[in-house]
Amino acid sequence: LLGGMALEAVLLARAAPGFVGNRLQFAVLREALHIVHSGIASAEVVDQVMRASLGRRYAMVGPLEAADMTGLPTVADIAHHLFPELATGDEMMALVEQRLQRGDTGQRSGRGFYLWDDARRERIQRRRAHQLRFALKP
């Protein structure tokens, strides 16, 4: 069943809070919030970069495969310079907390980082349906 949906079961070496997928997703989310909170880029730009580059790349190869393909010396050099600049705390959660205090809970309330009007919902629904059809093609 999983294979027919382009999903794969995995065997973990040990249990960890949050599962591997959620941990990776929230590492990306933490940095995305940090980028917006720090004024480096808007939410729109962060999402555009993810959709147009990283999202496509990670649909084909995982982060460690990508590191091998890039070359570990290059990865080590970039990491040496970039890691000190990445988010480590939780100060960027202020962006989420401010929205929650206003009652902006995301798609359900109609506002979060974006205004969730019918046009946005329909656009994303079409995009997701297209991607799902493509992923399920034999």
List each language-model region with its residue ranges.
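Hydrophobic alpha-helical packing residues
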Residues: 1-2, 32, 82
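Regular secondary-structure segments
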Residues: 33-37
